[in-house]
Design a protein with these regions (language model features):
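Beta-lactam-recognizing serine transpeptidase/beta-lactamase-like catalytic domain environment
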Residues: 68, 190-203, 241-289, 294-522, ...
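Periplasmic/cell-envelope proteins involved in peptidoglycan metabolism and beta-lactam response
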Residues: 1-267, 357-369, 520-553
Length: 553
């Protein structure tokens, strides 16, 4: 090797040695001497991981009126490590966040916390005030809160949502999977002032919820609520009033109302959470003489009696040595008159002819003892004695609606089947679910089963018309229209406590509307179904029929 080559090799060696030494020095400087400066620079930026709430679907009545919707609001967040003066920030913010100042200060002064939620669905006025404060480290995400434009109307049907926007009661709960939508997610870089830097690193847009269209007609709902509100003041019932209006041919619920009720915009403002439940589907009661409609239909369909067959009603009937008393002595009457004038004595004789097996077959066929499957949450199945445990006296009292417990929705559904041609219809309160302009699920009228023949149904309709024109239901007559119905009065759990009820329909020749009214333990101005519940049903039928013949036509 020449001296020139050796010299050149040595120079290259020295050059690479110097370069490697320089890199080592730089690495030591980065890791040690300047580490605090770099840490400060890194600390001046952070990421914000935000869940993007979808818009909840609206709920509409059958005419397109909005029953539940969203109004602008905001979610408020904090990045405590970016808040320079937690005490001052707490003082300025707490009044807009429904939080006490001390609790807010604990959150804002916790520098170990990356991210904190201060408020969900904060009203828009408060959001605007929070934005105007311009506090570094406080973020606002525009969102929505639930609103019920009609206030208390349909409160137990609609239910309400929680602070997180999820449904808690009513249709808001049972149809939450359609209404809620799918949340999105945004991950963004934020600076030391808590402001977003550049475009989001990741963005998954939320998918908004579906809209629900109900069978409820808010006009008929309004008539129904007005009628029971007047009655509530007049009769002062201890346990409230329930009213249901149904299209008997389709099973569509046109109105469903209960008192007492609540405002779903402020659901916490109630004496008890019981106000949130829906007695129309979740409470049970002895139906009393309204149940005679069921017994009579079963007897006529089974051909154990004819409408004109004559009976003698002495005011009592003896079963297994026990004297079962009727409410009055009616003497010589036909079976039709026994329905019109509500003879317990005759119905005990009729159910003896039917027998346990046949009677229970019809009880089951009419849907008693089973949930109807309506879209509302909290429905119960009622109480029917086991057939194997029933005694003759039990059978006798069940014939006129005692010793059996039903729900209001069961009763109006069964009653509708008696007067609609004999078909038990599945009751439903949802007409369809839509996403944009596309219907994704439709709830069509559904025949569960045919319970009685059209001939029996026709016979029952005209017997029930006479109950209103000549019998116990006279207070339900509507001038200009034919009305049929049946009254009921049941002594409740304690002496002197009664459930006054009435089930009615109109017009008799072509029923468009069926209505059931329960007044539970009225304390003044009467207690019998004919004097308390029938006038309420009359007002609902009158207003609804006029509405159908004018506006709807």
């Amino acid at each position: 090797m020449t001296s020139y080559v050796k010299k050149r090799t040595f120079i290259i060696f020295i050059f690479f040695t110097i370069m490697i030494f320089a890199l080592i020095v730089r690495l030591i400087w980065i890791q040690g001497i300047n580490s605090s400066k770099l840490a400060m620079a890194v600390e001046r930026q952070s990421t914000a991981d935000i869940i993007l709430k979808p818009q909840r679907g609206n709920i509409y009545d059958v005419n397109g009126n909005i029953l539940a919707c969203n109004v602008p609001a905001g979610d408020v967040f904090a990045a405590p490590k970016f808040i320079k003066n937690p005490e001052k920030a707490s003082e300025e913010l707490y009044k807009y966040l429904n939080m006490d100042k001390d609790s807010l200060y604990k959150i804002l002064s916790n520098k170990n916390s990356e991210w904190a939620v201060l408020g969900r669905s904060v009203p828009l006025d408060n959001i605007n005030k929070i934005k105007s404060l311009n506090i570094p480290g406080i973020y606002v995400e525009n969102t929505f809160t639930r609103s019920y434009p009609y206030g208390k109307m349909l409160s137990q049907v609609l239910g309400f949502t929680g602070i997180d926007g999820n449904g808690l009661y009513g249709l808001e709960y049972s149809l939450d999977r359609y209404l809620s939508g799918i949340p999105g997610r945004e991950i963004s870089l934020v600076d030391a002032e808590g402001r977003k830097v550049g475009l989001p690193d990741k963005l998954h847009k939320p998918v908004n919820g579906d809209n629900i269209v109900l069978t409820i007609d808010s006009v008929i709902q309004g008539y129904t609520e007005k009628a029971i509100e007047k009655a509530y003041e007049k009769y002062k019932p201890e346990d409230g009033i329930t009213a249901i209006v149904m299209n008997p041919k389709t099973g569509e619920i046109l109105a469903m109302a209960n008192l007492p009720d609540f405002d779903p915009n402020n659901p916490q403002d109630v004496p008890s959470q019981e106000y949130w439940s829906n007695p129309a589907i979740s409470s049970i009661y002895e139906p009393g003489s309204v149940f005679k409609v069921i017994t009579a239909s079963a007897a006529l369909e089974s051909a154990v009696v004819t409408p004109d067959e004559r009976f003698y009603d002495p005011g009592y009937y003896v079963v297994s040595g026990r004297k079962i008393r009727s409410w009055t002595v009616l003497g010589d009457i036909t079976f039709s008159q026994a329905i019109e004038k509500s003879s317990d004595t005759v119905f005990v004789q009729i159910v003896e002819r039917l027998g346990v097996d046949a009677f229970y077959k019809y009880i089951k066929a009419f849907g008693f003892g089973s949930r109807t499957g309506i879209e509302l949450p909290g429905e119960v199945s009622g109480m029917v004695l086991s057939k194997s445990k029933i005694y003759p006296v039990d059978l006798a009292t069940m014939s006129f609606g005692q010793g059996i417990a039903v729900t209001p929705i069961q009763m109006i559904t069964a009653f509708s089947s008696v007067i609609n041609g004999g078909n038990l219809m599945a009751p439903h309160i949802v007409k369809y679910i839509e996403n944009g302009d596309k219907i994704i699920k439709e709830y069509k009228p559904q025949i569960v089963r045919q319970v009685i023949s059209k001939e029996t149904s026709d016979t029952m309709r005209y017997i029930l018309e006479k109950t209103v024109t000549e019998g116990t239901g006279r207070a339900a007559q509507v001038p200009g229209y034919t009305v049929g119905g049946k009254t009921g009065t049941t002594e409740n759990y304690a002496p002197g406590k009664y459930v006054a009820s009435f089930a009615g329909f109109a017009p008799v020749e072509n029923p468009k509307i069926a209505v059931l009214v329960l007044v539970k333990n009225p304390t003044q101005n009467g207690y019998m179904g004919g004097e308390v519940a029938a006038p309420i049903a009359q007002e609902i039928l009158r207003d609804a029929l006029r509405y159908y013949d004018t506006v709807k036509k």
